[in-house]
């Protein structure tokens, strides 16, 4: 622990598993106070307890697509830990279908979480953190799928590409208005998560050098450490940028 995030107060959506949990863990390790969110209370409470006590981390049940719930989430976080300085919009879902085969219901559900949820968190984050001298940072989780197309991820591609460009717009607006709020995107490649563990042969397939030139997939902490940097004052001149962590996938 080096206290890189001492004095920071962060909200991490989808923070109960995988990448989100790793981000929350590293944030606390580096001195931040954190609220993680998720849809399932039992999973969320267990996740928070695995990281630390209620003096440093708490769980709030919240669906990122619930617009009204965002204000309550900020209020609850600030009552517990003080002014929010950092928002990590990490919550997301996937539908493995082509554009042709994706139903309207599937399309709207995915975008409600992956895009609307990020929009709600970004908008309210700006409104609540601007002009306060907090060194505020909004970190929006996109994906390598925000850069390249995948024939079986039509809706997911759309959502992650939209997050990438929307974040640039927000970053420019905040910079030009001297809000002291930075907005950046993180683009994971293939990462070892519970979902990957549950899919037989998935890790081996993703580790092929034609997909990941480094020959192995990443770990959640590979993404978490990038987020620590972006949440810290070390990244005070970084905004509107894309941070790709993919073992060389998009360099091909």
UniProtKB/Swiss-Prot annotation:
Residues annotated as binding NADP(+): 16-19, 39-40, 63-64, 90, 156, 160, 191-195
Instruction: Report the protein name in the record.
Output: NADP-dependent (R)-specific alcohol dehydrogenase
Q: Report the cofactors.
A: Mg(2+)
InterPro entries assigned: NAD(P)-bd_dom_sf, Sc_DH/Rdtase_CS, SDR_fam
Question: Which applications in biotech or industry are described for the protein in this UniProt record?
Answer: Because of its broad substrate specificity and its ability to produce chiral alcohols with high enantiomeric excesses, this protein from L.kefiri is a very interesting enzyme for preparative applications in the synthesis of pharmaceuticals and agrochemicals.
Q: Which UniProt keywords apply?
A: Magnesium, Metal-binding, NADP, Nucleotide-binding, Oxidoreductase
Q: Which residues participate directly in catalysis?
A: 156 (proton donor/acceptor)
Q: What class of enzyme is it?
A: oxidoreductase
Gene Ontology terms for molecular function: metal ion binding; nucleotide binding; oxidoreductase activity
One Pfam family per UniProt = adh_short_C2
> How does this protein's activity depend on the pH of its environment?
Optimum pH is 7.0 with acetophenone as substrate.
Catalytic activity, reaction form: a secondary alcohol + NADP(+) = a ketone + NADPH + H(+); acetophenone + NADPH + H(+) = (R)-1-phenylethanol + NADP(+); 2,5-hexanedione + 2 NADPH + 2 H(+) = (2R,5R)-hexanediol + 2 NADP(+); ethyl 3-oxobutanoate + NADPH + H(+) = ethyl (R)-3-hydroxybutanoate + NADP(+)
Gene3D superfamilies associated with the record: NAD(P)-binding Rossmann-like Domain
User: In the Enzyme Commission scheme, what number(s) does this protein have?
Assistant: 1.1.1.-
Q: How does activity depend on temperature?
A: Optimum temperature is 50 degrees Celsius with acetophenone as substrate.
Q: Which gene encodes it?
A: adh
Which residues does the record give as Mg(2+) binding sites?
Answer: 252
Its biological purpose: NADP-dependent (R)-specific alcohol dehydrogenase (ADH) with a broad substrate specificity, able to catalyze in vitro the stereoselective reduction of several aliphatic and aromatic ketones as well as beta-keto esters to the corresponding enantiomerically pure alcohols.
Q: How does it assemble?
A: Homotetramer.
Tell me which family the UniProt entry assigns to this protein: Belongs to the short-chain dehydrogenases/reductases (SDR) family.
């Amino acid at each position: 622990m080096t206290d890189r995030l001492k004095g920071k107060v962060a909200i991490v959506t989808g923070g109960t598993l995988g990448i989100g949990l790793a981000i929350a863990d590293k944030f606390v390790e580096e001195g931040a106070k954190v609220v993680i969110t998720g849809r399932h209370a039992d999973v969320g409470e267990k996740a928070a307890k695995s990281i630390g006590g209620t003096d440093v981390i708490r769980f709030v049940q919240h669906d990122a697509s619930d617009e009204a719930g965002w204000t309550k989430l900020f209020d609850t976080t600030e009552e517990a830990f003080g002014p929010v300085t950092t928002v990590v919009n990490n919550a997301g879902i996937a539908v493995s279908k082509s554009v042709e085969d994706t139903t309207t219901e599937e399309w709207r559900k995915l975008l409600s979480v992956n895009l609307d949820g990020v929009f709600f968190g970004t908008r309210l984050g700006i409104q609540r953190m601007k002009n306060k001298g907090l060194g505020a940072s909004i970190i929006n989780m996109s994906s390598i799928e925000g850069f390249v197309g995948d024939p079986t991820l039509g809706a997911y591609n759309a959502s992650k590409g939209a997050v990438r460009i929307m974040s640039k717009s927000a970053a420019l607006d905040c910079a030009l208005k001297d809000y002291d709020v930075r907005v950046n995107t993180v683009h994971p490649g293939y990462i070892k998560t519970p979902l990957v563990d549950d899919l037989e042969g998935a890790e081996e397939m993703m580790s092929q050098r034609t997909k990941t030139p480094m020959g192995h997939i990443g770990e959640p902490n590979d993404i978490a450490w990038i987020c620590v940097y972006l949440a810290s004052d070390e990244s005070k001149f970084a905004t509107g940028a894309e941070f790709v962590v993919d073992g060389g996938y998009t360099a091909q």
